[in-house]
Swiss-Prot record:
InterPro entries: UPF0145_dom_sf, UPF0145_YbjQ-like. Signal peptide: none annotated. It comes from Actinobacillus pleuropneumoniae serotype 5b (strain L20). This is UPF0145 protein APL_0465. Gene3D superfamilies: Hypothetical protein apc22750. Chain B.
Length: 106
């Protein structure tokens, strides 16, 4: 399945629009990771633990998006965007949402 941020796919024609599809993942970090990430922030480095968690959540959201697109009979998703938002206050929770338009291409 082709998943792209662009509204069209070079070399393919969109023959049918199936509608909006979403992939949503809510994730949280644990106390130990939070502690070491805060130390990293103080000394000015990058938090590999958080980056890894965010990357995993992004991949899961895209997998959910693809699953939903297949469910509605699409073979591609165009116009994909990703949103990241913290939630749960100081509990270290965040949500990653992938949104796009499911289409049939040939």
């Amino acid at each position: 399945m082709i998943i792209t941020t662009t509204p069209t796919i070079d070399g393919h024609q969109i023959t049918e629009y199936k509608g909006l599809v979403f992939g949503e993942v809510v994730s949280g970090a644990n106390f130990i990771r939070d502690f070491f990430a805060s130390i990293t922030d103080v000394i000015g480095g990058r938090s590999g633990a958080y980056e890894s968690k965010l990357n995993s959540a992004r991949q899961e959201a895209l997998a959910e998006l693809e699953k939903e697109a297949k469910r509605v009979g699409a073979n591609a998703v165009v116009g994909v965007s990703m949103e990241y938002q913290s939630m749960g206050g100081d509990k270290g929770m965040f949500i990653v949402v992938a949104t796009g338009t499911a289409v049939v291409i040939r």
